[in-house]
Amino acid sequence: MRLSYLSLALAIIFVLTIMHASNVEAKASADPEPDAVGSINVKNLMDMIREQITSRLKK
């Protein structure tokens, strides 16, 4: 009889844990690095310059 109470208690704890976990939200604890955004812009700029140079060399 005790085993059934134990399994019932574990099942209730499991269900309550799942129900509580759905209310938890993840939040960022740090700001993004300022260099990360800048390096993306530099990469795009370098790609544009490379395309311009190659298109002018083909003419």
Swiss-Prot record:
Q: Which residues form the signal peptide?
A: 1-21
Swiss-Prot/TrEMBL keywords: Antimicrobial, Secreted, Signal
Annotated GO CC locations = extracellular region
Location relative to the cell: Secreted
Pfam families xrefs = Pilosulin
Its domain of life reads: Eukaryota
Found in which tissues?
Expressed by the venom gland.
Would the keyword DNA repair be found if you checked this record's keyword annotation? no
For this entry, the protein name equals U-myrmeciitoxin(01)-Mg5a
